């Protein structure tokens, strides 16, 4: 694998501002922050879930650390959540011949607690758990065993609903040879439910699931008991932020991560807090005085926070955008961090708002990054940046890991494919890559500073308009929308004018003429809001589509 992240930028920078900044980037400090966060946990195994005491204590520590490094207006704000306070679960095979041996299991945010009850029943194996496997089965008073692969087949909600509507009293999920939880025999992967499920459910390791599966395939009858130390309740979670005030205080650049986690969550997402605070500290230590106000923010409810919804992972970000509409309206760049101290990619990859692709490309050249580079555009909601992007805020994020079958970005994958450790008990400091972490901290910090230094943000909507035009199949649309050709012409005009405005912004930035900069930026953000909120929609399956009417 090539090491694109070995560029330390020290000999390529055009400005003393950037040189001072990277000279003050102390990624060892950021590593210590991430390590410290893993100490805040509900059990010896980890867990900093929204609404738990561990999440609250972590948020307070982060606030104190923000103050210590010199951030201003440090604030903790709370919001309501459905707390999933999981400690442990066990599946025990009940046998007259052998002493029962409890097998440790995980569970799923959003499933109900069972209190002190122990669920006991006969196990029925339903293979992949789709409707065909339930033919002629009576599941009343039974526990089902399901083989899952949520990354490549069906998410848990679809499979668990099949069992629930047929009367299963509990669900045991396990894995086979592909997908999360299969890289090692002793992994337990924790994933959110993304729907309403009223049936208790647990997740077993590949090793333990195989024991049950093989016995059932051999025709043996298995009776098991399920116990679960889980408390679900109404609670409050938190987000924490601090600021470096700008000369233009009502325009914002946000650097964001989240600190809630399954298990220890070193990469996902203690590393993001390390990045956010590393960049904040380096800006302060270097003496950089920003034009716009920088907000350094971390969220305590990104993994889970609301039950019975597809977007249970958006709870914290949703609370932020409703509490702070002024941030949504006036943020010129939202820089999100996920798993920032690991990589499985062959080259630099970024998830970038379409209007910022040209800017980022030009900045990479200016910073002396000459390696391969590719990008994807945020057309769905998978993390906090997606929530802000859908509100019309320009976003970007470094992409460090993939699912093992993702090839669109080119070469990738292997030991650090995301399903091999993410949301498992092996997301710990052993996955840390110091060079990747330092590269991401320096690059993202410099991009944020560079955008801050631009009075006129040179946003370009030409690429978005090209994609919109490509989505207009005029032969099909003409049947129900007689103005399809007119719509196409409007998009082409927007594309042409956008290119002109982009070039004007470049010239104005070079000339240091700032008289109408605020008006220009506000117009740019309003255009982006219209594009993202009116033109970009989701279909019934939560896939991105363009709206044409």
Predicted regions, residues:
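Extracellular/luminal Protease-associated
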Residues: 50-52, 102-200, 371-374
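Noncatalytic luminal/extracellular "stalk/propeptide" segments of secretory-pathway proteins
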Residues: 2-7, 11, 32-35, 39-140
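Second-shell loop/turn segments in exported
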Residues: 16-25, 43-53, 113-114, 125, ...
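Charged, amphipathic alpha-helical linkers/stalks
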Residues: 425-513
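Soluble metallo-hydrolase cores and metallopeptidase-like ectodomains found primarily
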Residues: 16, 103-136, 190-266, 277-289
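Mature extracellular/periplasmic domains of secretome proteins
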Residues: 137-139, 158-171, 186-192, 316-327, ...
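Active-site-adjacent substrate-binding region
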Residues: 235, 340-466, 529-533, 537-544
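Acidic/histidine-rich catalytic neighborhood of metal-dependent amide-processing enzymes
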Residues: 151-156, 239, 261-355
């Amino acid at each position: 694998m090539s090491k694109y992240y070995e560029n330390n930028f020290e000999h390529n920078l055009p400005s003393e501002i950037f040189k001072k900044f990277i000279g003050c980037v102390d990624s060892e400090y950021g590593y210590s922050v991430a390590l410290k966060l893993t100490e805040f946990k509900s059990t010896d195994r980890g867990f900093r879930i929204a609404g738990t005491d561990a999440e609250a204590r972590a948020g307070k520590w982060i606030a104190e650390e923000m103050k210590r490094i010199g951030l201003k207006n440090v604030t903790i704000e709370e919001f309501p959540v459905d707390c999933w306070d999981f400690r442990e679960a066990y599946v025990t095979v009940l046998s007259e011949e052998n002493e029962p041996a409890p097998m440790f299991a995980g569970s799923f945010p959003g499933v109900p607690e069972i209190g002190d009850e122990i669920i006991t029943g006969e196990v029925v194996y339903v293979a992949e758990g789709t409707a065909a496997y339930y033919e002629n089965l009576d599941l009343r008073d039974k526990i089902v065993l399901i083989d899952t692969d949520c990354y490549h087949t069906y998410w848990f909600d679809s499979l668990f609903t099949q069992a629930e509507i047929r009367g299963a009293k509990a669900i045991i999920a396990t894995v086979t040879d592909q997908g999360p939880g299969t890289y090692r025999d002793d992994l337990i992967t924790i994933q959110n439910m993304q729907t309403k499920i009223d049936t208790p459910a647990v997740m077993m390791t590949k090793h333990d699931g195989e024991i049950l599966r093989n016995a059932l395939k051999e025709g043996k009858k298995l009776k098991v008991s399920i116990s679960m130390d889980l408390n679900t309740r109404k609670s409050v979670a938190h987000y924490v932020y601090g600021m470096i005030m700008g000369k233009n205080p009502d325009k914002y650049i946000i650097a964001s991560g989240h600190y809630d986690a399954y298990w220890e969550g070193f990469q996902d997402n203690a590393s993001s807090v390390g990045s956010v605070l590393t960049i904040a500290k380096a800006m302060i230590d270097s003496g950089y005085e920003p034009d716009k106000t920088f907000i350094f923010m971390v969220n305590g409810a990104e993994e889970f926070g609301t039950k019975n919804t597809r977007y249970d992972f958006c709870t914290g970000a949703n609370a932020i955008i409703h509490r702070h509409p002024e941030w949504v309206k006036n943020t010129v760049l939202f820089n999100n961090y996920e798993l920032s101290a690991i990589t499985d990619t062959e080259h630099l990859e970024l998830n970038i708002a379409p209007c910022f692709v040209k800017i980022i490309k030009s900045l990479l050249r200016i910073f002396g990054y000459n390696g391969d580079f590719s990008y994807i555009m945020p057309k769905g909601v998978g993390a906090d940046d997606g929530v802000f992007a859908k509100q019309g805020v320009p976003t970007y994020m470094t992409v460090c890991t993939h699912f093992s079958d993702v090839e669109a970005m080119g070469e990738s994958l292997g030991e650090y494919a995301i399903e091999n450790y993410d949301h498992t008990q092996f997301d710990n400091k052993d996955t840390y890559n110091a060079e990747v972490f330092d590269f991401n901290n320096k690059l993202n910090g410099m991009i944020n500073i560079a955008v801050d230094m631009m009075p006129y943000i040179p946003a370009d909507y030409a690429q978005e308009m090209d994609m919109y035009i490509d989505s207009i199949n005029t032969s099909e649309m003409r049947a129900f929308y007689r103005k399809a050709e007119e719509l196409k012409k409007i998009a082409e005009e927007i594309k042409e004018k956008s290119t002109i405005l982009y070039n004007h912004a470049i010239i104005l930035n070079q000339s240091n003429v700032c008289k109408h900069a605020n008006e220009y930026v506000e117009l740019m953000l309003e255009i982006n809001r219209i594009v993202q909120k009116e033109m970009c929609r989701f279909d019934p399956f939560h896939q991105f589509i363009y709206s044409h009417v």
